[in-house]
């Protein structure tokens, strides 16, 4: 009974991550729209950039998921069950999260270079502020997507379905 409660607690974090994944693109549109309006940039360029950003983030998210799946498969089920009973699964999740952060930062920087290359050529110094917003807009959904996949795979591994 205690094990099932802890498993349901981890599952609730998975639902929270899913909601954040769905909300993040709308927050991204608001931030970029406001920033570009203040700088009098072309809004069509902004919406085209948002579509590119979402497509590339989904692609990078799948690559991140495969990397995380490979890392999770190396963890024994007994060790995972023991960690959930003793530490609510935090030891295992933190071990995977360190790897997840590195992979997410790498792909975020790669996507940032691809997306901002032409923007820096057109807008020069004023694009510096956009670099920060764009990096956050790539990294946060990618990290949340990775966390969601990570927790889902962990739950299936615990139940013995992988």
Curated annotation (Swiss-Prot):
Membrane topology (UniProt): Multi-pass membrane protein
Keyword terms: Cell membrane, Membrane, Transmembrane, Transmembrane helix
Subcellular location: Cell membrane
Repeat recorded as keyword: no
Transmembrane stretches, start-end: 10-30, 50-70, 96-116, 125-145
GO cellular component terms, A-Z: plasma membrane
Record bears the keyword Transmembrane helix: yes
Organism: Methanocaldococcus jannaschii (strain ATCC 43067 / DSM 2661 / JAL-1 / JCM 10045 / NBRC 100440)
Main location, first listed in the record: membrane
Protein name: Uncharacterized protein MJ0792.1
């Amino acid at each position: 009974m205690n094990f099932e409660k802890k498993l349901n607690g981890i599952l609730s974090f998975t639902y929270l991550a899913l909601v954040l994944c769905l909300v993040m693109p709308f927050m991204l549109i608001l931030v970029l729209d406001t920033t570009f309006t203040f700088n009098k940039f072309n809004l069509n360029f902004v919406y085209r950039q948002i579509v590119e950003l979402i497509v590339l983030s989904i692609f990078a998210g799948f690559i991140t998921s495969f990397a995380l799946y490979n890392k999770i498969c190396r963890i024994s089920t007994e060790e995972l069950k023991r960690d959930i009973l003793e530490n609510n699964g935090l030891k295992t999740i933190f071990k995977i999260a360190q790897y997840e952060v590195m992979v997410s930062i790498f792909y975020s920087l790669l996507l940032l270079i691809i997306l901002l290359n032409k923007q820096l050529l057109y807008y020069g110094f004023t694009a510096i502020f956009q670099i920060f917003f764009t990096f956050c807009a790539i990294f946060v959904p990618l990290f949340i997507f990775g966390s969601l996949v990570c927790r889902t795979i962990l739950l299936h591994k615990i139940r013995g379905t992988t």
